[in-house]
Structures are given as C-alpha cells and as structure tokens.
A protein has these predicted regions:
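Residue-level recognition of single "structural anchor" positions
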Residues: 1-228
Length: 228
C-alpha cells in the first residue's frame, strides 16, 4: 500500500546490492545461493560528499541477471551511475544505458580492506532494515508479507527528514485510498495454527509386586473394592 506506482526512480549515483533477510545461510556460495532466507535487492542514492538519499527494496527470485537487471531498471532512472560489486549478474547494466562502475570484493580482500566498505550506503540501509524488523516487529514477519514490510520501511526511511508530519499522514491516506481493500482474513489466511485434539495423559499402573501378599505385610495386598 505504501508504494506509489508513479513514483520517481532513483537518480544520480546509486549503489545496488543484495542481502538476505533472515541472515546468510551457512554452506552456501557467497550471497547469491538460495536457501530458506529471502534474497532482497537494495538500491540507495549516494549524496556527496557523505550522505544517503532515497532507497528502494524488493524481493528477488535469485541472484541471476534475469532478476537483478529488471530490479535495477524498475527502480533506477536511465543514465544514472550504478555502483555494484563484480557479480556477473550485473554485467548487462551498461547495455541498458547505465554508467556501470564495478568494485571487486576479492580485490578488496587482497588489499586487506573490508569488502563492506565498497558499498557503504547500501550496507547501512540493509543493516537498518534488518534491525527495524528485529526490534519493531520482533522478527515475526511471514515471507508472504515481507514485501509489504519492506515497503513500509522504505516509506519511513525516505521521509526521515520530513518536517511536516501532516504531509506524511496525508500521503499515507492518499496511498490507502488508492489501494484495493484488504481484508484481515486475507492477510492471515494460511497462518492460523491447526486445531488438534488434546491427547489424554497415559494411565500409570502400580508395580506387579503389589499384587502379591507378603507375610507380615498385609498392606502390600492388592487393593479390593470396599464392601462396607
């Protein structure tokens, strides 16, 4: 709901990368191998000398060019300068009309530098988004609704410097009025726990030794119904 279909694409210098929402999967190659976590594309405007402009976030099918190039073209204006790492999924950006600058993580490691410093803006936004999901929502976000949560984060982040709360509220109402109605039961469909019948506790019997009478110990005899 918090995404305007006609919003302007990012321009100027834009950093683009991907991250896992849910943490990296151990044993998978790099940050592109698929697992149970959700791969998310992030694009962030870089403002000189040191600043961050707007951002965009969207779920990706995988880390291939078939997913990454449409993400960039949907969220970054033509003729913008796009900065990425050296992943081969971005190699077609120049053909789409972007000034593409690649920064190699392998070369950074060889120089003893931190690879995260190659794309500082996009990594900062990714860290803020994950912290927001873990703190505000306690990490209780279903994958089916993750894009809606990311849209909310982007809406808040892009208006973090707004001085008019009234205009922000007006924008929320405007977007809500132009969105199709969403019922609560549609949001929670498929997330309800299954109803199961309670299992009665197992009946404990007495030890077999209590069934026989021991001389001098009548209390060890088997219990008989009271006859009055």
């Amino acid at each position: 709901m918090l995404v305007h279909q006609g919003r302007k694409r990012l321009n100027g210098t834009v950093e683009v990368d991907e991250t896992y929402i849910g943490g990296e999967e151990p044993g998978l190659a790099g940050g592109r191998a698929q697992g149970k976590n959700v791969l998310t594309g992030i694009a962030v405007e870089v403002r000189e000398p040191k600043g961050i402009g707007r951002c965009r976030m969207a779920l990706l099918e995988d880390g291939s060019a078939a997913s990454l190039l449409p993400f960039v073209s949907d969220h970054v204006a033509p003729a913008a300068t796009v900065i990425t790492d050296a992943w081969m999924g971005y190699h077609g950006l120049a053909k789409l009309g972007y000034a593409h600058r690649r920064r190699s993580q392998r070369a950074a490691r060889a120089r003893g530098e931190d690879p995260a410093a190659l794309l500082p803006a996009v990594h900062r936004v990714a860290s803020l988004a994950k912290r927001w999901l873990l703190s505000t929502h306690q990490g209780a976000v279903e994958p089916a609704h993750l894009q809606s949560y990311l849209d909310e984060f982007v809406f808040r982040f892009n208006r973090r410097r707004s001085r008019s709360r009234g205009m922000v509220f007006y924008r929320v109402l405007e977007l809500a009025a132009g969105h199709e109605p969403v019922r609560y039961r549609n949001i929670t469909a498929g997330n309800k726990p299954r109803k199961t019948s309670p299992v009665p506790p197992a009946t404990r019997g007495h030890p077999p030794s209590l069934d026989r009478v021991t001389a001098g110990r009548p209390w060890r005899a088997a219990h008989l119904p009271y006859s009055g």
